[in-house]
Amino acid sequence: MAEVDEFSAFRHENDVSIEQRIVYFINSLIVALVPVYLYHAIFFMSIDDHMIIYGSVTLFAAIVLTFAYNNIYRMKRLKLSASREHISIASKNKVGDKKKFAAAQKEVQALVTSHEAIAASIMYNNAVFLICVSIFSFIIFKNVPLVYNYIISISLGAGLTSFLSTSSKH
């Protein structure tokens, strides 16, 4: 019975809260809107004429980036938690048998670790996405017509970012 409880706690630990999903989606929407400004300012693609394309591709990229944020968040949180487990064990040996204090300290440490993992996930994925979009749009697909350049560059940038987030090397 204890094993079942342990596994269910692990399963629920990997669930993403609604707040996190909202934060991820808002951040991914903001980052996916950056190329809209670039294409409007640099390539003179009118926002009024291409509103449907901008909106649909940006929404697609935001959804894909949301999954990438979650993947990196999980890996970063596990790595940070594992590295900080040694710190909490060492501090328990020094403090003694103050179980309430240790439990509160562990809870605060888990919350801080979670926030740090969210921040690292957002920074990493934003950088990868913007670098991919820049390389695709300005170097690889520079001779493709602008509308197709935008669609391909943003979609591939988001897809590649999501693909790279599934790697176990983080």
From Swiss-Prot:
Keywords: Endoplasmic reticulum, Membrane, Transmembrane, Transmembrane helix. GO terms for cellular component: endoplasmic reticulum; endoplasmic reticulum membrane. Pfam families: TRAP-gamma. Residues 46-51, 142-145 are cytoplasmic. Residues 1-24, 73-121 are lumenal. It is a multi-pass membrane protein. GO terms for biological process: SRP-dependent cotranslational protein targeting to membrane. InterPro entries: SSR3. The chain crosses the membrane at residues 25-45, 52-72, 122-141, 146-168. It is found in: Endoplasmic reticulum membrane. Its main location: endoplasmic reticulum. TRAP proteins are part of a complex whose function is to bind calcium to the ER membrane and thereby regulate the retention of ER resident proteins. Belongs to the TRAP-gamma family. Heterotrimer of TRAP-alpha, TRAP-beta and TRAP-gamma. This is Translocon-associated protein subunit gamma. The lineage of its organism: Eukaryota, Amoebozoa, Evosea, Eumycetozoa, Dictyostelia.
